[in-house]
Amino acid sequence: MVKIKFGISSSLHPEKIPAPEEILNFAEQAENYGYDSLWMGDHIAFHGHYTDSLTTLAAFAARTSKIIIGTAVFLVPLRRPAIAAKIAATVDFLSGGNRFIFGIGIGGEGKKEFELCGVPVRERGKRTDESIEIIKKLWTGEKVEHKGEFWNFSSVSQTPAPLTKGGPPIWIGGRSDAARKRAVMKGNGYISYLYSAEKFKEGLTKMHEIANKTKGILQIEEGLWTPAHHSFIFCHKDEGFALKSGIKNLSRRYNMDFSGIAEKYLIFGPPEKCLEDIEKFKHAGVKHFVFKHAGPPEEELDQLALLSEEVIARAKN
């Protein structure tokens, strides 16, 4: 049986750009506190301050030794697939292999990002599907060709290939039926975002149905396909303060008012309440949690310790 894993995502910094050493220290501390995985979100131009996801993960790999690193999620349609394949393969290579998960999604909430990159928003799904096909071809390290709607090439290879046999696992993020189908048909896992436990269970049931009709069972317990959940979390003894802080964080992050819906998607409050919420997701089928700090930015490092010692250690037991 697959053991449930717990990861942490480096948070968006809505007000100030952190010093480089702060970002790298976060990675070291995540490994020191025993987290299974370390993640980066991805945006080209969004609300707040983001470093580039794959470049930052390469730096994380150099400052750590064994923690899994991953993108949650990399916005594939904003890049040419050959460039994405090359950089992702390099991250896998430099991290030593079997440490990198390439979480990808189609994006869309940041319309200006698509304008900036010259990509029509309406094409993002089709571009993602074709990009996955190209990336997998290029990761073989062999000479390959491709004829598609957006890209065409012949007799081209990229080296070095990823050290991970077959390439890094690709997890598909999203909340739509199309994303779930993409995760089953083209991915090695699925990662939900802004979901309730009930919605996650419903989505996983649909993915099992898709798999049974097309490719057979999802090999979850064999560790070959992973249902994951990305959740904002703020563990604090004062439940009201935790919720208020979470609303403020999410509202800044997305430049919209989350006061009416934050409670539905946040894990917040004292350790006991956070554990109860995590248990709901475990029963819904989550095998890998990716937490992102939803409280005041200055408390992010303190949360690393608190979550590890008071929540995750107990959730694993």
Where are these regions (language model features)?
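Active-site-adjacent structural elements that line small-molecule/cofactor binding pockets in enzymes
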Residues: 1-317
